[in-house]
From Swiss-Prot:
This is C protein alpha-antigen. Residues 1-41 form the signal peptide. The gene is bca. May play a role in both virulence and immunity. Coiled coil: none annotated. The modification Pentaglycyl murein peptidoglycan amidated threonine is found at residue 990. It is found in: Secreted, Cell wall. It holds the Pfam family AlphaC_N2. Residues 261-281, 306-330, 342-363, 388-445, 470-494, 506-527, 552-576, 588-610, 634-658, 670-692, 716-740, 752-774, 798-822, 834-856, 880-904, 962-989 are annotated as: Disordered. A motif (LPXTG sorting signal) lies at residues 987-991.
C-alpha cells in the first residue's frame, strides 16, 4: 500500500490555479503544449491531445514505467484502485509509476466525461483512465526521442470493497457466537480470513467484489448450531444396599451413576442425602454437569435394610417404690423385687446405683439395670421413701448470741446479756447466763455462755460477746509533731503558711499548726527560730520550732564584668556576618558571656560608618550591651555606569541592503568614553517592509558593556491587486435537477470591499442532475489586470430515499416448549433492525399458538420515522412436550402360589412384575405384605418408578394354599361315657376331645369363617 501526496498542478480544487500557453522549441520543431493534459478535448482555444492507453513500459523513450511491485494496484499494465483505500487516505497516484532520476510527474483522472485532479474526488466504481505528464529536471515537459511530449495514460479499474468488508465483519461476529459448533465456526472464520487476505493483497473488479459478497453469504450458511451435551448423553442412576445406620458418602453415591464414555460429565449429589438410620428405599438426586455447562439429573437408590431389634427395645420394665422409717436398712433384693419385668423377657435386675441412705429422710432414687439374654440392658429407677424420726427442739431451732460495747468500768447485768440472745420465734426457748460474768474494768472482748432451755427439756448453748472499750488518751500524748526548716535569699519575705507548712503532723491526728513566736526578719542573714503551736481536736496542744535560714544576696554578672565593642573596615558591597561582628567584642576572661547581634545589620552597599548593637548574656541571665563599628569604604564606578550611549534610526526602500557599519554609525557614543560599537543582534531583512530593531553592543576600555537598539525603517514596494485581496468562493445547496446560472454562482464569491474585482465563471458548469459536490472555477479580474481564481461549491442533494429502502431488517427465530406463551415483546426482540434506522417493530400477524407443536410464522411490521414500513417474519419453533414415562409404558402384575406359612420377600414380589423393555422402571412394594400364615389370595400393591419420576401401580397376587391336615387332626377316637351320680356329666378331659360332634361342629364353624375370609378378600 502507499500514501497519498498532493498534486498541486492538477488539483482543480486549488484556488488561484492559472493556465497558460507556452511554445517550447525542441531541435527544429516547435510544439504547442496544453498544461491540463485532457487528451482529445478542446477547452477554450487549447488543443490538447492524449497518448494511447498502454503500459508505460511499452512507450519508447518514456521516463516513466509502471510500479509493478505494488501488486494490489498494478497488474498486466493496468491500474486498480479500491475506494475503501481512498477513504482511508492510502492511495497516492504518483506511487503507481517509477520515474527516472530527476523527473517529476503530474496526473489527472478521467471517468466518463468527468476529470479529477485528486484521487479523493473519485466516488463511483467502473472503468477510468489515469494520465501522467512527465517533466524533466528543468521543470519543462519531457520530450521523448520521437519528438512527442511524454504523456502516459493507464487503464484504471475502480472498485469498492467497503460493503464486502462490512459483511465479513458482520459474519465474523455471528460466527463467534458460542451457539455454533467449533468445527463450523473454524471453517467459516478460515474462509473469511482467506477472502480478506485476497482483497487486501490482490486487485479486483466490482464484479469480483460482488461475487465475494455471495461467497461470504454462503459461508455464513455453513454455521451449525451445537447440540447441548445433556441432549447427547443419557446417564443412569444405580442402586446399593446398606445395613441400617451405615453412612453413605457423596462419592459412594456418585460412583453408582453410569456416565457415557467421552461425555466428561461430572456427577454431584444435589438432593437430600439418605438417612440410613431409617430402613427402606431412599432416592438421592444426582446432577451430572457437562463441559458445556448443561446438566442431567438421575436418581440413585439406597436400599437400607433394617437391623434386628435388641431386647432392650422390645421390652419396657418399670421401677417400683417402697416406704421405710428413717434408719431402717433396705437390701438389694428388696429393691430388685420392686422392678416389674415383662413376662417372657427373661430380664435379670441388678442394683447398679448408690444404695439408699435410710438415715436420711426423703425420697431416694436407686438405679437398677435389667440385663436381657441378648446382652442388651435397660435402666429403671426404684424410689425408697424414708420417713423422718421426730426432731428434738434443740435440733429444730438455732439460737444465736449477740454482742454489745460498753466503756471500761461500766457494769453489765444478766438480763442485758440474755436480751442479746436471738431465739427463733415459736421455739419458746428460755435463756439463762451459766458462764462467768464479764469484768468490765478490763478492756477487751469478754465471752459469756448463755443456755437456752426448750419446752421438751432439750437445751442449746450460745455465746454473747461484751466489748469493753478503754478510757481515751489525750491527743498531745498520742502524737509527736516535728518542726522543719527552709532556706530563703536575703530580703525574701516568709508567710505564716510557708512556716506552718514546714511542720510535720502525724497522719490522722487532725492537728492544726499556728505561728505563736516572733516572725523571722529575712533582711538579716542567718538562722531564725520560729515557735509553732499544734492544736488537736480534743483541745490539747504541742509546741515545735521551725528554722528559717536566710542567705545573703549574690552580685549579678553584669555588675562584675565590663565588655567592650571593637571596629572593622570593609570595601563597599562586602557582606559582614554576625560572627564577624561578635568576634570584634572583647569579653572579660572567666565571665562566660555570650555575644549576640541585636541591632540592625550594617548595609555595606552604603559607604560610611555603621554602628551595630551587640548584647552579651552571662550565665546568671544578666546582660550587657556594647557597640561595634563597621567602616565601609566606597568602590570605583565602571564605565558602563558612567556613560549613556543611544541608538539612532534610518529609512531604506524594500530590498535595499544595510551594512553593519551603516548601523553602528547611527549609534551616539559620549565623548571621552572611548566606547566601540558592534552589531550583535540579527541583521535587518530589508526584503520585509516594516521596522527592524538591530541590537548594538558598546564595549568600554574597562571591559564593561552597554547595549542599544538601532531602528531600520523598510518602506514597502507597491503590491499588485491579486496579492492585496483574498476573495473566497462560497457554497450553495440545491435539490437534484435544479439548474444553477452563472450569476447565481458568481454571486456566491465574496470579493473584498474596495478591490473592484469582477467575477467570471471559467470552469465547467455543475451538472445538477448528478447528486454530490460540484466544484466551479470562478476568475476574479482586478482593475490592474491581475487575476485571482476561486472555487464555488454546489452541493446537489439527492432525492430523499425512503427509510424502508435504506434499511433491511431481518426476522429472527426462537424455540419454546409446547404450551409456553410468547409475548409480543419477545417476538419483536427477535427482529434485527439496522443501527441508526430508529425502526419500531410491531406484531401485525397472528400470534403463535404454542399449544400446537411445529414452526409458527409471525408477521412483524417495522415502522420508520418517515412513516414507511418494512415487513419481516419471525419463526417460533414449538417443541412438543415430552410424554411422561408412565403414559409410555404399561407394566403388569404377575402371580405366584406358595404353601401356607412360607414367607414371600419383596424381591420375589417385584420379580413378578413385567416391566416393558427400555423403560428402566424400578418396582417397589408399597402395599401390605401378604400374611402367608392365612391361606387364600393376597393382593400386593407394587409401584413402578420411571427415570422421569413418574410412577405406575400394579397388583401382584400371592395364592397361599392351606397346609394339609394331619390324620390326628382329622380323626377323634372316643372312650365310653361314664356316669357320675347317675347323671350324664363328663369326666374331666384327660387326653383327646371327648365327642366327635364337637370336633365336626368346630371344623364346620372354622371352615365357614375361613370361607368368609377368603370371600371377603376376593371382594376387597
Amino acid at each position: 500500500m502507499f500514501r497519498r501526496s498532493k498534486n498541486n498542478s492538477y488539483d482543480t480544487s486549488q484556488t488561484k490555479q492559472r493556465f497558460s500557453i507556452k511554445k517550447f522549441k525542441f531541435g527544429a520543431a516547435s510544439v504547442l503544449i496544453g498544461l491540463s493534459f485532457l487528451g482529445g478535448v478542446t477547452q477554450g482555444n487549447l488543443n490538447i491531445f492524449e497518448e494511447s492507453i498502454v503500459a508505460a513500459s511499452t512507450i519508447p523513450g518514456s521516463a516513466a514505467t509502471l510500479n509493478t511491485s505494488i501488486t494490489k494496484n498494478i497488474q498486466n499494465g493496468n491500474a486498480y484502485i479500491d475506494l475503501y483505500d481512498v477513504k482511508l487516505g492510502k492511495i497516492d497516484p504518483l506511487q503507481l509509476i517509477v520515474l527516472e532520476q530527476g523527473f517529476t510527474a503530474k496526473y489527472v483522472f478521467r471517468q466518463g466525461t468527468k476529470y479529477y485532479g485528486d484521487v479523493s474526488q473519485l466516488q463511483s466504481t467502473g472503468r477510468a483512465s489515469l494520465t501522467y505528464n512527465i517533466f524533466g529536471e528543468d521543470g519543462l515537459p519531457h520530450v521523448k526521442t520521437d519528438g512527442q511530449i511524454d504523456i502516459v495514460s493507464v487503464a484504471l479499474t475502480i472498485y469498492d470493497s467497503t460493503t464486502l468488508r462490512d459483511k465479513i465483519e458482520e459474519v465474523r461476529t455471528n460466527a463467534n457466537d458460542p451457539k455454533w459448533t467449533e468445527e463450523s465456526r473454524t471453517e467459516v472464520l478460515t474462509g473469511l480470513d482467506t477472502i480478506k487476505t485476497d482483497i487486501d493483497n490482490n486487485p479486483k473488479t466490482q464484479t469480483d467484489i460482488d461475487s465475494k459478497i455471495v461467497e461470504v453469504n454462503e459461508l455464513e450458511k455453513l454455521l451449525v448450531l451445537s447440540v447441548p451435551d445433556k441432549d447427547k448423553y443419557d446417564p443412569t442412576g444405580g442402586e446399593t444396599t446398606v445395613p441400617q445406620g451405615t453412612p453413605v458418602s457423596d462419592k459412594e453415591i456418585t460412583d453408582l451413576v453410569k456416565i457415557p464414555d467421552g461425555s466428561k460429565g461430572v456427577p454431584t449429589v444435589v438432593g437430600d442425602r439418605p438417612d440410613t438410620n431409617v430402613p427402606g428405599d431412599h432416592k438421592v438426586t444426582v446432577e451430572v454437569t457437562y463441559p458445556d455447562g448443561t446438566k442431567d439429573t438421575v436418581e440413585v437408590t439406597v436400599h437400607v435394610t433394617p437391623k434386628p431389634v435388641p431386647d432392650k427395645d422390645k421390652y419396657d420394665p418399670t421401677g417400683g417404690e417402697t416406704t421405710v422409717p428413717q434408719g431402717t436398712p433396705v437390701s438389694d433384693k428388696e429393691i430388685t423385687d420392686l422392678v416389674k419385668i415383662p413376662d417372657g423377657s427373661k430380664g435379670v435386675p441388678t442394683v447398679v446405683g448408690d444404695r439408699p441412705d435410710t438415715n436420711v429422710p426423703g425420697d431416694h432414687k436407686v438405679t437398677v439395670e435389667v440385663t436381657y439374654p441378648d446382652g442388651t440392658k435397660d435402666t429403671v429407677e426404684v424410689t425408697v421413701h424414708v420417713t423422718p424420726k421426730p426432731v428434738p427442739d434443740k435440733d429444730k431451732y438455732d439460737p444465736t448470741g449477740g454482742e454489745t460495747t460498753v466503756p471500761q468500768g461500766t457494769p453489765v447485768s444478766d438480763k442485758e446479756i440474755t436480751d442479746l440472745v436471738k431465739i427463733p420465734d415459736g421455739s419458746k426457748g428460755v435463756p439463762t447466763v451459766v458462764g462467768d460474768r464479764p469484768d468490765t474494768n478490763v478492756p477487751g472482748d469478754h465471752k459469756v455462755t448463755v443456755e437456752v432451755t426448750y419446752p421438751d427439756g432439750t437445751k442449746d448453748t450460745v455465746e454473747v460477746t461484751v466489748h469493753v472499750t478503754p478510757k481515751p488518751v489525750p491527743d498531745k500524748d498520742k502524737y509527736d509533731p516535728t518542726g522543719g526548716e527552709t532556706t530563703v535569699p536575703q530580703g525574701t519575705p516568709v508567710s505564716d503558711k510557708e512556716i506552718t507548712d514546714l511542720v510535720k503532723i502525724p497522719d490522722g491526728s487532725k492537728g492544726v499548726p499556728t505561728v505563736v513566736g516572733d516572725r523571722p526578719d529575712t533582711n538579716v542573714p542567718g538562722d531564725h527560730k520560729v515557735t509553732v503551736e499544734v492544736t488537736y481536736p480534743d483541745g490539747t496542744k504541742d509546741t515545735v520550732e521551725v528554722t528559717v535560714h536566710v542567705t545573703p544576696k549574690p552580685v549579678p554578672d553584669k555588675d562584675k564584668y565590663d565588655p567592650t565593642g571593637g571596629e572593622t573596615t570593609v570595601p563597599q558591597g562586602t557582606p559582614v556576618s554576625d560572627k564577624e561582628i561578635t568576634d570584634l567584642v572583647k569579653i572579660p576572661d572567666g565571665s562566660k558571656g555570650v555575644p549576640t547581634v541585636v541591632g540592625d545589620r550594617p548595609d555595606t552597599n552604603v559607604p560610611g560608618d555603621h554602628k551595630v548593637t551587640v548584647e552579651v548574656t552571662y550565665p546568671d541571665g544578666t546582660k550587657d550591651t556594647v557597640e561595634v563599628t563597621v567602616h565601609v569604604t566606597p568602590k570605583p564606578v565602571p564605565d558602563k555606569d558612567k556613560y549613556d550611549p543611544t541608538g539612532g534610526e534610518t529609512t531604506v526602500p524594500q530590498g535595499t541592503p544595510v551594512s553593519d557599519k551603516e548601523i553602528t554609525d547611527l549609534v551616539k557614543i559620549p565623548d571621552g568614553s572611548k566606547g566601540v560599537p558592534t552589531v550583535v543582534g540579527d541583521r535587518p531583512d530589508t526584503n520585509v517592509p516594516g521596522d527592524h530593531k538591530v541590537t548594538v553592543e558598546v564595549t568600554y576600555p574597562d571591559g564593561t558593556k552597554d547595549t542599544v537598539e538601532v531602528t531600520v525603517h523598510v518602506t514597502p514596494k507597491p503590491v499588485p491587486d491579486k496579492d492585496k485581496y483574498d476573495p473566497t468562493g462560497g457554497e450553495t445547496t440545491v435539490p437534484q435537477g435544479t439548474p444553477v446560472s452563472d450569476k447565481e454562482i458568481t454571486d456566491l464569491v465574496k470579493i473584498p470591499d474596495g478591490s473592484k474585482g469582477v467575477p467570471t465563471v471559467v470552469g465547467d458548469r455543475p451538472d445538477t442532475n448528478v447528486p454530490g459536490d460540484h466544484k466551479v472555477t470562478v476568475e476574479v479580474t482586478y482593475p490592474d489586470g491581475t487575476k485571482d481564481t476561486v472555487e464555488v461549491t454546489v452541493h446537489v442533494t439527492p432525492k430523499p430515499v425512503p427509510d424502508k429502502d435504506k434499511y433491511d431488517p431481518t426476522g429472527g427465530e426462537t424455540t419454546v416448549p409446547q404450551g409456553t406463551p410468547v409475548s409480543d415483546k419477545e417476538i419483536t426482540d427477535l427482529v434485527k433492525i439496522p443501527d441508526g434506522s430508529k425502526g419500531v417493530p410491531t406484531v401485525v400477524g397472528d400470534r403463535p399458538d404454542t399449544n400446537v407443536p411445529g414452526d409458527h410464522k409471525v408477521t412483524v411490521e417495522v415502522t420508520y420515522p418517515d412513516g414507511t414500513k418494512d415487513t419481516v417474519e419471525v419463526t417460533v419453533h414449538v417443541t412438543p412436550k415430552p410424554v411422561p414415562d408412565k403414559d409410555k409404558y404399561d407394566p403388569t402384575g404377575g402371580e405366584t402360589t406358595v404353601p401356607q406359612g412360607t414367607p414371600v420377600s419383596d424381591k420375589e414380589i417385584t420379580d413378578l412384575v413385567k416391566i416393558p423393555d427400555g423403560s428402566k422402571g424400578v418396582p417397589t412394594v408399597v402395599g401390605d405384605r401378604p400374611d402367608t400364615n392365612v391361606p387364600g389370595d393376597h393382593k400386593v400393591t407394587v409401584e413402578v418408578t420411571y427415570p422421569d419420576g413418574t410412577k405406575d401401580t400394579v397388583e401382584v397376587t400371592v395364592h397361599v394354599t392351606p397346609k394339609p391336615v394331619p390324620d390326628k387332626d382329622k380323626y377323634d377316637p372316643t372312650g365310653k361315657a361314664q356316669q357320675v351320680n347317675g347323671k350324664g356329666n363328663k369326666l374331666p378331659a384327660t387326653g383327646e376331645n371327648a365327642t366327635p360332634f364337637f370336633n365336626v361342629a368346630a371344623l364346620t364353624i372354622i371352615s365357614s369363617v375361613g370361607l368368609l375370609s377368603v370371600s371377603k378378600k376376593k371382594e376387597d
